[in-house]
């Protein structure tokens, strides 16, 4: 008994309402067509031939359609969704990062099987480069990128495109299973330290000893102007009823303050006033005081003086 296959591609097999077949896989960049399909590279979905849609429509397949991809030569497997059914017969197109996980080359054989996966509740990722820390809000970026994915598999290294740069993330853990569906799910996301990341060394801070007297060298400045520092005189020549004003202050006594540029937040410094007290001056001698209207007057009309 002989069997003939008139097609160059394998015929899909159906076992107990399960889709299972083999395809020659190629990267999305080799997909023929006028439109740029770079959007497929940004997600976790594949492009299958129309015959697969015909077979799947006859089966009692639960939606969304999820598939398990297996490379039997390297014993590597992953999970994915389907984006379109426009590939040539016997061929499927995969994102480049998915082919790297499966260790597949262009034109290699991959086993495609339909599966049902549980909805994800938790996932943990490890960035493969410290450059991922440059992203301001990594959770928001990851949430936006995962909209193009249908499922996650523990151990996979997925690639996301952000700000014209490719970031790779390893799926460290998924719950409740090692392969989960992330379509319409409420999933908690956590991050591991990036691969090759080192904690920055913090400088050792030595406690500064508190000196007995404050150092005023940083507050030295030019001599300031002091208003109303002179002495006054009364018209009647009498002595003022208050104590005499102090002598002019020496240039070194009053100095303009300079801000302390070495001030540290949270540190309180009690500065002692080490300036000497102003000494009182003695009263001026009586003869040395100014007496108003003490001169001689002159008259325009000369009068004889009485003896």
UniProtKB/Swiss-Prot annotation:
Protein name from the UniProt record: Ubiquitin recognition factor in ER-associated degradation protein 1
PANTHER family: UBIQUITIN FUSION DEGRADATON PROTEIN 1, UBIQUITIN RECOGNITION FACTOR IN ER-ASSOCIATED DEGRADATION PROTEIN 1
GO molecular function: K48-linked polyubiquitin modification-dependent protein binding
Protein's pathway: Protein degradation; proteasomal ubiquitin-dependent pathway
Family membership noted in the UniProt record: Belongs to the UFD1 family.
Main location: nucleus
Organism: Mus musculus
Pfam families: UFD1_N1, UFD1_N2
Residues where Phosphoserine is found: 129, 231, 245, 247, 299
Region of interest (Disordered), residue spans: 230-255, 288-307
InterPro entries: Ufd1-like, Ufd1-like_Nn, UFD1_N1, UFD1_N2
The protein's assembly and partners: Heterodimer with NPLOC4, this heterodimer binds VCP and inhibits Golgi membrane fusion. Interacts with USP13. Interacts with ZFAND2B; probably through VCP.
Origin: domain of life: Eukaryota
GO cellular component, one term: nucleus
Key words of the record: Acetylation, Cytoplasm, Nucleus, Phosphoprotein, Ubl conjugation pathway
Annotated function: Essential component of the ubiquitin-dependent proteolytic pathway which degrades ubiquitin fusion proteins. The ternary complex containing UFD1, VCP and NPLOC4 binds ubiquitinated proteins and is necessary for the export of misfolded proteins from the ER to the cytoplasm, where they are degraded by the proteasome. The NPLOC4-UFD1-VCP complex regulates spindle disassembly at the end of mitosis and is necessary for the formation of a closed nuclear envelope. It may be involved in the development of some ectoderm-derived structures.
N-acetylmethionine modification, residue list: 1
């Amino acid at each position: 008994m002989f069997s003939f296959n008139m097609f160059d591609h394998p015929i899909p097999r159906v076992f107990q309402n399960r889709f299972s077949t083999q395809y020659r896989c190629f990267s999305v960049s080799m997909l023929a067509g006028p439109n740029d399909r770079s959007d497929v590279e940004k997600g976790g979905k594949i492009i299958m031939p129309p015959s697969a849609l015909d077979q799947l429509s006859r089966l009692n397949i639960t939606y969304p359609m999820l598939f398990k991809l297996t490379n039997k030569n390297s014993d590597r497997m992953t999970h994915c969704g389907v984006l379109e059914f426009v590939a040539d017969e016997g061929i499927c197109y995969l994102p480049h990062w998915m082919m790297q996980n499966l260790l597949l080359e262009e034109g290699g054989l991959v086993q495609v099987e339909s599966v049902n996966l549980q909805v994800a509740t938790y996932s943990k990722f490890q960035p493969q480069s410290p450059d991922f820390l440059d992203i301001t809000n990594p959770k928001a970026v990851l949430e936006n990128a995962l909209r193009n994915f249908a499922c996650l598999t523990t151990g996979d290294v997925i690639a996301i495109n952000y700000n014209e740069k490719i970031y790779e993330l390893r799926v460290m853990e998924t719950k409740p299973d090692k392969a989960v569906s992330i379509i319409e799910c409420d999933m908690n996301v956590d991050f591991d330290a990036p691969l090759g990341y080192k904690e920055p060394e913090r400088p050792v801070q030595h406690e500064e000893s508190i000196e007995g007297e404050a150092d005023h060298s940083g507050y030295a400045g030019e001599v300031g102007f002091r208003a109303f520092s002179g002495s006054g005189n009364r018209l009647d020549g009498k002595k003022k009823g208050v104590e005499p004003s102090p002598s002019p202050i020496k240039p070194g006594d009053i100095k303009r303050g300079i801000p302390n540029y070495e001030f540290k937040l949270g540190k309180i410094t009690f500065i002692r006033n080490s300036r000497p007290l102003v000494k009182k001056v003695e009263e001026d001698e009586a003869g040395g005081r100014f007496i108003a209207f003490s001169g001689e007057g002159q008259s325009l009309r000369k009068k004889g003086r009485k003896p």
